[in-house]
Design a protein with these regions (language model features):
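N-terminal helicase ATP-binding lobe
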Residues: 1-504
Length: 504
C-alpha cells in the first residue's frame, strides 16, 4: 500500500476529472440525498405498467394488462398443476379507452424484446419453476426467492399477478422446512443470482446510523467509533454528512477515489496532500470562489486557493491534517466541522513508524469536537480508553457513540496452509479454546465476514442431528419466519450454537 505523503501529480488530477459510470453515479446520488432522508431506496427493475408509462385508473390498467398479457400464462399454470385458484375480473374493468389500447399495442414489439426483464414475468417464471419442482429440495430455492422478490420496492406490480403468486405460496406452504434451506444456504441464499440481480439499492444500516447521528441538530460534539466491514461504503459515507468534512486517509488511492466521487456529484472539494503549510492546499474548480478566466476560452486557469468558503469536503493525507483543520476553521464554525479519520489504526501494528509522531500531534492539537474514527478493524471502546478519556478532557460535553456493523453480502473465507476453510469448530482442539474464541467473536462480529456459510450450515445440521440442543435454540424456534434466515443471521446463529456447546 502506498503511504507516501506527496502532492498530487498532473495525471492524478486528470484522473479526478474522469466521470464515474451511470450506475455508480446513481448510488452516489442516493448517498448524497440521504442527508435529508436515510430511508430512500430504489430498484432498477420495472413493472409492466412502469415500462409503458401510462397514467389513468390503476384498477382498469391492471385489469386490462393482466387480461392481455398475463392471463394465458396464469391459466396454463392453473390447468397444468391443477391449482384451485380463481381470478375474477369484472368485465367493465377490462375495457380501456381505444386510444390507450392502441398505444399499448403499439408497444408490443418493445414489450416482446424486454419481456424477460419485466418484473411480473420474472415473478411468473419463478412461480412456475416453484410448482414444477414438486417435492424436490430445489422447490425451497424458488419459495425463498419469491418471498424476498415480493418485498422489493417495485412500483405498480400487477395486482392480479401478485394475488396469484401469494395464493400459491399460502396454499403450498413450505414455510417451516428450514432444514432444506440451511442445507443449501450457499446456493439458495448467499449466491442466489435472482436476489442479487433484483435487490433494492439502499444504504447499509451503519450508514443510516451514522447520518442520523451526524446530521442531527445539536450543540455538543461527538466522537463516533465507526466499525463496519470492508467494502460496505464507509469511505463514501462522508458524502451523506451535512457538516463540512475533513477526510483524512493514509492511503492516497482512497482519498483520490472519494475526491473523484465528489467531483462527479459536483461537490466543492479541496485537496491537501503533501502540505508543508496552508498555502499548499488546492481547490477544485467547483470550490473556487475567486478566480481568473482565460479571455479567449472562458475557462478557469488561475484560482485563489486561499478563499475556501465554498469547500464542503477537504481530502487530506495524515501529515496535512492540521493545515486542513486550520484552513476549514477560517471559514466555518467549529461545530459545523467534522474530522473523518479513515483507518486510524494504520501503522499502529509497528513498534515504531514515522507516522506515529504525526498521529500523536494531530490528536493532541485537534480542535474539532466532531470526530469519526472509521475502520473495519477499529478497537472496541474499552481497548482505547486512554484515547476516549483524552477526548472527554478536551471536549467535556462531547458524546461517545459506537456504530458497529457486521452486515455483509459476501463471504471471504479464510483458507489455512493446507487449503482447508478455517472455522472455530474446525481449528481448535480444546473446548476452552472454542469458548475463548466465541467470547472474542461476540465482541468483534466484523470477523464473521470470513466465516464460510457452507461450513456453518454443516455445523448447524450436525448440532440438530445430535439432538443435544435445547428447544429454544433449535432452528424452528430460533427463526420466526423463513425470510429471517439470511447470511448474517446464520452466522450469528452459528455463534449462538457454539456458545451453547457443553464440554461432554
Amino acid at each position: 500500500m502506498d503511504l507516501t505523503q506527496k502532492k498530487l501529480t498532473k495525471s492524478e488530477w486528470e484522473f479526478l476529472e474522469v466521470p464515474v459510470d451511470k450506475k455508480e453515479l446513481k448510488i452516489l446520488n442516493l448517498i448524497f440525498n440521504s442527508r435529508e432522508n436515510v430511508e430512500i431506496k430504489y430498484n432498477e427493475s420495472k413493472s409492466f405498467l412502469e415500462f409503458i408509462k401510462m397514467n389513468g385508473n390503476l384498477d382498469t390498467l391492471h385489469a386490462y394488462i393482466y387480461n392481455s398479457y398475463f392471463k394465458n400464462l396464469v391459466n396454463n399454470m392453473i390447468d397444468k398443476f391443477n391449482l384451485q385458484i380463481k381470478i375474477d375480473i369484472p368485465k367493465k374493468l377490462i375495457r380501456l379507452k381505444s386510444a390507450d389500447s392502441i398505444r399499448i399495442k403499439n408497444l408490443n414489439s418493445k414489450i416482446k424484446d424486454i419481456r424477460d426483464q419485466l418484473y411480473e414475468y420474472i415473478l411468473l417464471t419463478s412461480i412456475y419453476n416453484y410448482l414444477k419442482e414438486g417435492k424436490n429440495d430445489r422447490k425451497m430455492f424458488y419459495y425463498y426467492t419469491l418471498i424476498h422478490l415480493l418485498k422489493n420496492d417495485i412500483k405498480n406490480i400487477n395486482k392480479y399477478v401478485i394475488y396469484f403468486i401469494k395464493e400459491i405460496l399460502i396454499t403450498n406452504n413450505i414455510q417451516k422446512d428450514y432444514k432444506k434451506l440451511i442445507k443449501n444456504s450457499c446456493e439458495y441464499i448467499e449466491r442466489n443470482t435472482l436476489l442479487i440481480k433484483y435487490c433494492n439499492v439502499e444504504l447499509y444500516k451503519h450508514q443510516k446510523d451514522l447520518f442520523r447521528n451526524m446530521n442531527a441538530n445539536r450543540k455538543n460534539g461527538k466522537l463516533i467509533l465507526y466499525q463496519a466491514p470492508t467494502g460496505t461504503g464507509k469511505t463514501l459515507s462522508p458524502i451523506g454528512i451535512k457538516k463540512k468534512i475533513i477526510f483524512v486517509c493514509a492511503a492516497k488511492h482512497i482519498g483520490l477515489q472519494l475526491a473523484k466521487s465528489c467531483i462527479s456529484l459536483e461537490i466543492p472539494i479541496a485537496i491537501a496532500f503533501g502540505c508543508k503549510d496552508i498555502s499548499d492546499i488546492r481547490l477544485h474548480y467547483f470550490a473556487a470562489k475567486e478566480f481568473t478566466k482565460h479571455r479567449r476560452t472562458g475557462q478557469i486557469f488561475r484560482v485563489d486557493n486561499s478563499v475556501g468558503d465554498k469547500v464542503e469536503i477537504i481530502i487530506s493525507d495524515i501529515q496535512s491534517y492540521l493545515y486542513s483543520m486550520r484552513y476549514m476553521m477560517a471559514f466555518n464554525e467549529l461545530n459545523d466541522l467534522c474530522w473523518y479519520w479513515d483507518e486510524p489504526t494504520i501503522t499502529l501494528d509497528y513498534e515504531t513508524h514515522e507516522f506515529h509522531e504525526i498521529l500523536q500531534k494531530n490528536w493532541k492539537e485537534n480542535e474539532i469536537p466532531n470526530i469519526i474514527l472509521s475502520s473495519a478493524t477499529l478497537p472496541n471502546q474499552k481497548d482505547i480508553f486512554p484515547m476516549i478519556r483524552n477526548y472527554k478532557s478536551k471536549f467535556p460535553l462531547g458524546e461517545i457513540e459506537n456504530i458497529i456493523s457486521y452486515e455483509c453480502k459476501k463471504t471471504i473465507p479464510i483458507i489455512d496452509s493446507n487449503g482447508y476453510v478455517a472455522m472455530p469448530h474446525l481449528i481448535f482442539d480444546t473446548f476452552k479454546d472454542i469458548k475463548s474464541s466465541v467470547k472474542f467473536l461476540m465482541n468483534n462480529k466484523t470477523i464473521l465476514r470470513h466465516f464460510d456459510i457452507g461450513e456453518i450450515s454443516k455445523f448447524i445440521l450436525y448440532c440438530h442431528k445430535k439432538t443435544f440442543l435445547k428447544e429454544r435454540y433449535k432452528m424452528l424456534n430460533y427463526f420466526e419466519k423463513i425470510e429471517d434466515i439470511t447470511v448474517i443471521s446464520l452466522k450469528i446463529y452459528y455463534l449462538e450454537l457454539l456458545s451453547k456447546l457443553k464440554k461432554d
